[in-house]
From Swiss-Prot:
It comes from Actinobacillus succinogenes (strain ATCC 55618 / DSM 22257 / CCUG 43843 / 130Z). GO terms for biological process: nucleobase-containing small molecule interconversion; pyrimidine nucleotide metabolic process. InterPro entries: Cytidylate_kin, Cytidylate_kinase_dom, P-loop_NTPase. This is Cytidylate kinase. Belongs to the cytidylate kinase family. Type 1 subfamily. ATP binds at residues 7-15. Keywords: ATP-binding, Cytoplasm, Kinase, Nucleotide-binding, Transferase. It catalyses: CMP + ATP = CDP + ADP; dCMP + ATP = dCDP + ADP.
Length: 227
């Protein structure tokens, strides 16, 4: 069984998906992390200076994507992400990598290279929670349950700002908001697999909801679809 959760950055997909996976005993696929790992791998080649893969080189990026060794492993109550055996969970959450991932994700060849990798996750375990931008529309169009989680750009910027503050990192709210709006525009207007709800997805707006409310509504919907 596959449950897809799509939506823009900062809407709360990661928290919701982890809660659903834990509650239902399903595996978790964070497709955004896969694109971030691809971007990180490209940035690492640039740092090493050998066979550097540029972020505007679609086919070099696609070739790199096909060779990625990515694992999602639960550790200490969180899902840790490994690239070639190295835990890169922290590295892929930086703003530089996030921006690079959004640029990498616009290329059809890269999306095609990563499509099979993502679909293979559905073959593991009794079920899969798939977190992303096009899980319900492209990667798993026949998923039994589809959710689309959204929130206003302002609310998502507030959450990101508070998250940075909690980590002792200075953040500029206006800059964060501008970056979110720019990323939204790229994601919603790319030619291949643009960010949009599947026709048969439940729309959840988390702007005014607590995460507990979002989880409760999602679980109730899943139960209604699988009863």
């Amino acid at each position: 069984m596959v449950i897809t959760v799509d939506g823009p950055s900062g809407a709360g997909k990661g928290t919701l998906c982890y809660a659903l996976a834990k509650k239902l005993g399903f595996s978790l696929l964070d497709s955004g992390a896969i694109y971030r790992v691809t971007a990180l791998a490209a940035l690492k080649t640039q740092e090493q200076g050998q066979s550097a893969v540029k972020l505007d080189d679609e086919f070099a990026l696609a070739e790199l994507a096909r060779k990625l060794d990515i694992q999602f492993l639960p550790q200490n109550g969180e899902v840790q992400i490994f690239l070639d055996g190295e835990n890169v969970s922290g590295q892929i959450r930086t703003q530089d990598v996030a921006d690079a991932a959004s640029k990498v994700a616009v290329f059809p060849a890269v999306r095609s290279a990563l499509l099979q990798l993502q679909q293979d996750f559905a073959k593991q375990g009794k079920g899969l929670i798939a977190d992303g931008r096009d899980m319900g529309t492209v990667v798993f169009p026949n998923a039994q349950v589809k959710l689309f989680l959204d929130a206003s750009a302002e609310e998502r910027a507030k959450r990101r700002y508070k998250q940075l503050q909690s980590k002792g990192i200075d953040g500029n709210f206006a800059q964060i908001l501008a970056e979110i709006k720019e990323r939204d525009f790229r994601d919603r207007n790319r030619l291949v697999a643009p960010l949009k709800p599947a026709d048969d997805a439940l729309l959840l707006d988390s702007t005014e909801l607590s995460i507990e409310d979002v989880i409760a509504q999602a679980l109730a919907y899943i139960e209604s679809k699988t009863a």
